């Protein structure tokens, strides 16, 4: 078997109005004939966690090529910046088209730019042994590292997700799943795709990223992409399981400033004050935010200003403490 190589490829290109040309690239680590896997990031332009994960994976793979090039048995593709225009402008969607790119799949090769890009990505990813689509939260909320799975595909994906070294597996019912996402489109056509979400928009949380990197490397080793004797970081996190029946949404009862009283990713008790909503114009507390159940606080508001109905937290109800 020949030693592993690395190359940068352009998988999508289109002419822009002012004699410019947009090119979307991927980094490919070429090994042997074992399975092909991929990591996708930057579908939303305000989500940067996945870009750093791709960097950390590239660092690890560069070192593997230097020290043990024969240990890469398959091919690894990193797609760190799908929505380049959104990333350039700190815009969640695709600028000009005002489109959420993750609502354009599976796309159309003859459609407008969002659909063409979606179709090109589908073509590039189809047939992979596993795709990991990495997202951050928006700028308003902080999420613990988690995998989100449509229950339609849970038999296939949950066993893989358990090895991803994340803290939560959130199973979504079919009624709450958007079918125009890259993950749903890939899973529907037989290419396994996990959605990982963590952190907060427009920020990087390095320890979350390293946690996910360890999980991805362990899964790649399980799939035979990496040699059995390769040393990978320990995957020490055991995920909790959440579904639509035990996830509780806490929405603001009034507008104001949300001041958290509980720490993110901690055990909370039923009735415990998780935060308060106050007014900058007076000294009164406008509203207390209390946990409806015993559970774990896995989503917490990062941006303090809230309107009535704004999401402030999510609690996963369960018995006992967090292990």
Feature map (PLM): residue ranges:
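Structured catalytic-domain cores with a bias toward divalent-metal coordination
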Residues: 1-323
């Amino acid at each position: 078997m020949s030693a592993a190589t690395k190359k940068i490829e352009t998988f999508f290109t289109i002419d822009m109005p002012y004699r410019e040309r947009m090119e979307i690239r991927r980094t490919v680590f070429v090994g042997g004939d074992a399975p092909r896997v991929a990591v996708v990031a930057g579908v939303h332009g305000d989500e940067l966690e996945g870009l750093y994960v791709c960097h950390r994976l590239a660092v690890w793979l560069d070192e593997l090529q230097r020290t043990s090039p024969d240990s890469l048995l398959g091919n690894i593709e990193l797609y760190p910046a799908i929505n380049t225009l959104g990333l350039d402008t700190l815009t969640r969607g695709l600028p000009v088209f005002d489109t959420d790119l993750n609502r354009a799949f599976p796309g159309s090769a003859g459609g407008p730019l969002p659909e063409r890009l979606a179709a090109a990505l589908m073509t590039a990813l189809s047939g992979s042994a596993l795709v990991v689509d990495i997202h951050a939260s928006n700028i308003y909320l902080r999420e613990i590292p988690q995998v989100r799975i449509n229950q339609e595909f849970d038999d296939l994906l949950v066993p893989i997700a358990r090895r991803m070294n994340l803290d939560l597996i959130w199973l979504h019912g079919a009624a709450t799943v958007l079918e125009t996402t890259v993950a749903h489109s890939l899973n529907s056509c037989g290419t396994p795709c996990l959605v990982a979400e963590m952190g907060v928009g427009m920020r990087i949380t390095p320890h979350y990223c390293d946690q996910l990197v360890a999980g991805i490397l362990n899964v790649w080793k399980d799939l035979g992409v990496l040699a059995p004797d390769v040393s990978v970081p320990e995957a020490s996190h055991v995920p909790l399981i959440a579904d639509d029946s035990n996830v509780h949404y806490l929405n603001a009862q009034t507008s104001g400033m949300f001041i958290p009283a509980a720490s993110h990713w901690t055990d909370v008790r039923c009735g415990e004050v998780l935060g308060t909503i106050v007014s900058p114009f007076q000294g009164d507390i406008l509203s207390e935010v209390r946990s409806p159940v015993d559970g774990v606080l896995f989503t917490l508001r990062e941006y303090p200003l809230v309107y009535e109905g704004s999401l402030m937290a999510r609690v996963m109800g369960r018995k006992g403490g967090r292990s």
